[in-house]
Design a protein with these regions (language model features):
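Active-site-adjacent beta->alpha loops and helix N-cap segments on the catalytic face
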Residues: 46-61, 78, 93-106, 113, ...
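Generic structural signal for hydrophobic
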Residues: 30-34, 58, 83, 104, ...
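Glycine-enriched alpha-helix->loop->beta-strand junction motifs that scaffold or abut catalytic
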Residues: 38, 63, 85-91, 107-112, ...
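Catalytic cores of alpha/beta
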Residues: 77-85, 120-126, 164-177
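Hydrophobic faces of well-ordered beta-strands that scaffold small-molecule active sites
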Residues: 15-17, 42-44, 69-71, 91-92, ...
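N-terminal/domain-start segments enriched in small and hydrophobic, helix-friendly residues
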Residues: 27, 35-39, 118-131
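Single conserved hydrophobic/aromatic residue that forms the stacking wall/gate
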Residues: 182-194
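Conserved N-terminal beta1-alpha1 strand-loop-helix module at the mouth
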Residues: 1-77, 82-86
């Protein structure tokens, strides 16, 4: 799928479910349930054991393009390449990495790095990030979107961390292109169950 088509589908959806799970089977069930509930954007994190194989299985299962499947918690270009080869449509990371940006640009795959300051947002945009992930969003609240869009009206942003059903409308009103929402189990719940 073309990079432009992926970005359009993600922004049309407006919501991306962040899937963390204890195992591959659980991750697939959560992803299927999100899609069945109408959420076509899925970010499968590389904290899931065998995440590359889960991405490959979901990419094959939904090869019709019904699911916009991304890889999350991508910390380096090696992991990004693994995810892209497995079938990920986009790459999300908790922080900006210049080499990951280069790799994603080479393959024309959208890269959405986590940024917490306007300097980080500018650096990511200059490196070709199409959408910047505001993370951790709960430290700032929706007001940060207005603050960043003041000097950077062209910035395309999506928040994660602290975005939930009670405040997602506030983020959308603030001008984000999409929101990332965590599915269950939370990272804390996952640690407890081990």
């Amino acid at each position: 799928m073309l990079k432009e088509d992926v970005l359009k589908k993600l922004t049309d959806c407006g919501l991306v479910a962040v899937v963390r799970a204890n195992n591959a089977e659980e991750a697939i069930k959560i992803s299927d349930a999100c899609l069945a509930g109408g959420c076509t954007g899925i970010e499968l994190t590389f904290t899931v054991p065998g995440a590359d194989k889960v991405i490959a299985a979901l990419a094959e299962k939904y090869s019709n393009g019904e699911m916009m499947l991304g890889a999350g918690t991508v910390l380096d270009p090696e992991t990004a390449r693994m995810a892209i080869l497995a079938g990920a449509n986009f790459i999300v990371s908790p922080a900006f990495n210049a080499e990951t940006a280069k790799l994603c640009n080479r393959y024309r795959v959208p890269y959405m790095p986590g940024c917490a300051t306007i300097t980080e947002v500018i650096t990511a945009m200059e490196a070709g990030a199409d959408i910047v992930k505001i993370f951790p969003a709960d430290l700032y609240g929706p007001k940060i979107i207005k603050d960043i869009k003041g000097p950077l009206p062209q910035a395309q942003m999506m928040p994660t961390g602290g975005v939930d059903k009670d405040n997602v409308a506030d983020w959308i009103k603030a001008g984000v292109v999409a929101c990332l929402l965590y599915t269950s189990p939370s990272p804390r719940d996952m640690r407890r169950s081990r």
